[in-house]
């Protein structure tokens, strides 16, 4: 390994993305090699709570500020935060050189149990298996959970499978999914010391 390669391995993987549309204005800064520090304000309290889980359990430093047309509903802001987060993940990983690529985790929360398996494959695909018993958690529409994950998947270009093994409380189920996603994400983006700067694909590209 060259000195340049060694230097690259030591550099924190960060990204800053600003997405502005006629509906929302979203700014995200993240550090994949962080400690779980976060400042999050999307205007959607439940989404803020879930993103805090992602940061804390994924050890991703995360700053998110979103302003959206919440007077209409939460849909545009929820989706655009997912889009911007996916873009930030893709930017931080660049060509995905030297990472483990795959991640998986089971997360319990009381009666809920959720599994997440993911692959930074470059091929966006979501297999979503959460069965949420209520239409809302507080004011947050539970159908927006899938929309958030789909937005992340499309723009981070990853394959994501979410499976619910148990759960009765919608809040517990969704939170377990975010915790499992965080830990699977942490596993997948970890640098692989054996691979060093190699691309984790037999094709040589992701």
UniProtKB/Swiss-Prot annotation:
CDD domains (UniProt xref): IGPD
E.C. code: 4.2.1.19
Ranges where the record places region Disordered: 1-21
Family matches, as Pfam families: IGPD
Transmembrane feature ranges: none
UniProt subcellular location: Cytoplasm
GO molecular function, a single term: imidazoleglycerol-phosphate dehydratase activity
GO biological process: L-histidine biosynthetic process
Record-linked InterPro entries: IGPD_sf (IPR038494), ImidazoleglycerolP_deHydtase (IPR000807), ImidazoleglycerP_deHydtase_CS (IPR020565), Ribosomal_Su5_D2-typ_SF (IPR020568)
Pathway: Amino-acid biosynthesis; L-histidine biosynthesis; L-histidine from 5-phospho-alpha-D-ribose 1-diphosphate: step 6/9
Reaction it catalyzes: D-erythro-1-(imidazol-4-yl)glycerol 3-phosphate = 3-(imidazol-4-yl)-2-oxopropyl phosphate + H2O
Family listed: Belongs to the imidazoleglycerol-phosphate dehydratase family.
Name assigned to this protein: Imidazoleglycerol-phosphate dehydratase
